[in-house]
Amino acid sequence: MSSHQPRKRFGQHFLHERGIIQRIVAAFDPKPTDHVVEIGPGEGVLTRELVGKVARLDVVEIDRDLIARLRESLPEAVTIHSADALKFDFCALAPHTDVPVSRETGSRERPPSHGKLRVIGNLPYNISTPLLFHLLDQAHCVSDMLFMLQKEVVDRMVAAPGGKDYGRL
C-alpha cells in the first residue's frame, strides 16, 4: 500500500516501526475467541497483525481515502466501518442474544468477558479525551481497551493536582 499523506484535521499519525507494532500486539495478547474493534486503523499495519489471531475483527475509520485502501488490501474477514468513532455505537457490535438466563435471578447475566469487545487503537491527539469518555459510556460492552496515546494526553491524565500538566481533560 502506498503511503497516505496524514490529514491534520483527523489528527492522523501512523504506526510504521515493526518492533513497536509487535510490542503493542504482545501487550494486547489477542486470543482466538476475541472480538476486537480497532479504532483508526490508518494504513492497516496493526490490523494486519491482528488478522487470523482473533475470531472477529472490526475496524472504525473516518477517512474515506483510507477506507478505500483498506477495502482493497485487507481480507474480507475484516469488517470495515466508515464512521466517526466519537459517534459510533460500539455496543451494537457486541452480541446480546446468546447470554443465558440466570437460574438464581431470572435475568440475563453475562460472565465477565462473554460477548464483550476488546478495543485497540492508535488514537489521534485531537479526539483522545472525548473518545475515551465516549467509550466509558459504553464500558458495559467492553472487556478491555489498549490505546497508544500522545505523551501530552497521558501526562495530563496522570498529573497530580496543582502540577504543571494538571488540567481539565
Regions found by a protein language model. Give the residues of each.
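Residue-level detector of alpha-helical transmembrane segments in integral membrane proteins
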Residues: 104-105, 117
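Short, low-complexity intrinsically disordered segments enriched in A/P/G/S/L with frequent Arg
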Residues: 99-104, 110-112
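Catalytic cores of RNA-modifying enzymes
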Residues: 1-98, 113-169
